[in-house]
């Protein structure tokens, strides 16, 4: 998580994780700098206090090299810390689709042998990296499922799943549907503003 800043959607995610049966909730959170390479709006201590007040039991800082990295590296750092705890059974994350099983299909497609060749072919055709990833994943999981990559929280969820597979973490996954405004929306939706709007 980044919690930049902590908002009602983050509180809803923690509550949904608890409602799904979590007896304890450990969060891995970036420190004072975020994936965008910018300082977080609030210091990490304030964001930790908000997370604890809203139901998290433990907040672990994701070290800077992972916190400021692309989704694949960010996810690997977070998953490795949770795995090191030795007690995590379920990895819960927010996502636009709310369906961890569908995200697992995309993750498997991206780890299939045909993926890299299809990715190279799409990149050579001149499409953006994001579009090329989606095209390459569709070879194994179909266009509709691969389209889940078009959404940033889905993409991060997919990278958490891929990291868990690479690291041999035996986690189950809980995808909690994002509530309120979309990731990049600057308007409030259903009483919940995105981090983008708040920043």
What do the predicted segments below correspond to?
Residues 24-26, 59, 90:
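Structural preference for beta-strand elements that scaffold enzyme active sites
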Residues 61-199:
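Active-site cores that bind ATP or allylic diphosphates and position pyrophosphate for catalysis
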Residues 42-46, 54, 69, 73, ...:
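Generic alpha-helix structural propensity
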Residues 1-47:
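N-terminal catalytic cores of NTP/NDP-binding nucleotidyl/phosphoryl-transfer enzymes
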Residues 48-64:
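A glycine-rich helix N-cap at a beta->alpha junction
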Residues 18, 52, 83-84:
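Non-catalytic positions within long, well-ordered alpha-helices that form the structural scaffold/packing
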Residues 20-22, 56, 87-88:
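Short, high-confidence coil segments that cap the C-terminus of an alpha-helix
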Residues 46-49, 114-115:
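Acidic, Ser/Thr-rich peripheral helices and adjacent loops at domain boundaries
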